[in-house]
Amino acid sequence: KIREEIQVTLDEHFGGGDVSEFLRRVNEDPAFTFETEEAVLQYSTDALDAAKAAMPRAFGVLPKADVLVKPYPEFAESGSGEYHSSSEDGTRPGIFYIAVADPTGRSISNQLATLHHETFPGHHLQGAIALELGDQQHPLARYLWNSGYGEGWALYSERLADELGLYPTPLDRIGLYSDQI
């Protein structure tokens, strides 16, 4: 089914072709990669701003804590992206660390799927609210990570972001789909 969704997008917006070949191309062709480290960071920051603005349309409760996009420190710059949680009282923001090194080797296509998985409506939304609920929730639910629930929510959130219009280009949608293969 996911390959079929990719094929439809490929046929409608990229002139058709073989899915596997196109996915290889979007990861290697400079036309589908970033030019500078600053461009990687700006693209993700702009997308996060759009996601934050869309959340009230889908959720009645939002976390007090903000979430920021930051580049990985140099010693860890080979990662693809990860979320570090906010504080329980909401005063310290969550951080979404992204790799900006080697921008010409970094495909634009999957940036948004990763961002939505890790921030809004993904891990940050779910995790920050769980922390901020305090005693309204059992401590195990607040402090221990349940990977089945957390990753299930984050995968769902990638598709929810699509329903909210947060994948503005066909290439972004290809990235959403290809991350789910």
List PLM regions with ranges.
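N-terminal maturation segment of proteins
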Residues: 1-181
